[in-house]
């Protein structure tokens, strides 16, 4: 019994130490010295989850009516059964509408035949304007912690690594709270909560600014934002069952 108590205490201490190391300013951006998040098994993938009755369905497999290319033109990605598939090198896509505070749900499947490693293995992202939740194959594929799957890219590693193997459907359920500005100054940070495969991996985290690579940048005033799915020019990642709920 005593050994079980000691083991539980040690695990709790490790979790606290990891949480303290997650703050964006605790390490240089993209530092490989940050602790890796603990790995958890999220369980098997289930069937596509139905959208709530008050949701706006952004993609149900039937077409790209709610989407446009990165330049406002036609979507350059493919339709495959009930999913959309990235055409590597064709560019990002984005929603036609702009949104404020929202809950966004989507499912994605990574390429099981990807030849890459680290950041070059099924890399993509879900953007709320300038703020990114990373999409990556992080199943037995180490990389810098603030760039792995379900990281708030360049800022917060996930609380745990809840990745499934590539080739299996995975899900993100994300709550985005927009920053508040007064006279061009951010008086409230943007916040993100993320569930990866139904596991809490980001808990209402305050962002220190927009997403960037290798540098940190400050907030710039903006209004409602488009949801953007990234073409990182790596692999033919698939997305399906995308819906959004506006939060009042």
Which residue ranges define each predicted feature?
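Bacterial N-terminal signal peptides
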Residues: 1-9
């Amino acid at each position: 019994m005593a050994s079980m108590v000691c083991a539980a205490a040690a695990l709790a201490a490790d979790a606290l130490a990891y949480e303290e190391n997650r703050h964006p300013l605790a390490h240089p951006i993209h530092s490989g010295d940050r602790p890796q998040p603990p790995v958890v098994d999220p369980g098997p993938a289930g069937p596509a989850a139905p959208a709530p009755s008050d949701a706006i369905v952004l993609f149900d497999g039937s077409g790209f009516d709610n989407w446009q290319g990165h330049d406002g033109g036609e979507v350059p990605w493919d339709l495959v059964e009930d999913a959309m598939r990235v055409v590597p090198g064709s560019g990002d896509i984005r929603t036609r509408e702009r949104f404020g505070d929202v809950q966004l749900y989507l499912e994605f499947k990574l390429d099981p035949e990807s030849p890459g490693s680290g950041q070059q293995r099924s890399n993509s992202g879900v953007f709320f304007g300038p703020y990114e939740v990373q999409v990556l194959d992080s199943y037995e594929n180490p990389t810098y912690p603030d760039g792995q799957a379900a990281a708030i890219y360049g800022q917060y590693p996930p609380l745990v690594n809840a990745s499934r193997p590539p080739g299996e459907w995975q899900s993100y359920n994300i709550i985005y709270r927009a920053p508040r500005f007064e006279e061009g100054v951010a008086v409230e940070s943007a916040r993100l909560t993320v569930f990866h495969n139904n596991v809490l991996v980001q808990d209402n985290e305050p962002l220190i600014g927009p997403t960037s690579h290798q540098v940190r940048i400050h907030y710039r005033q903006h209004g409602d934002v488009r949801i953007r799915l990234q073409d990182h020019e790596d692999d033919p990642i698939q997305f399906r069952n995308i819906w959004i709920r506006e939060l009042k």
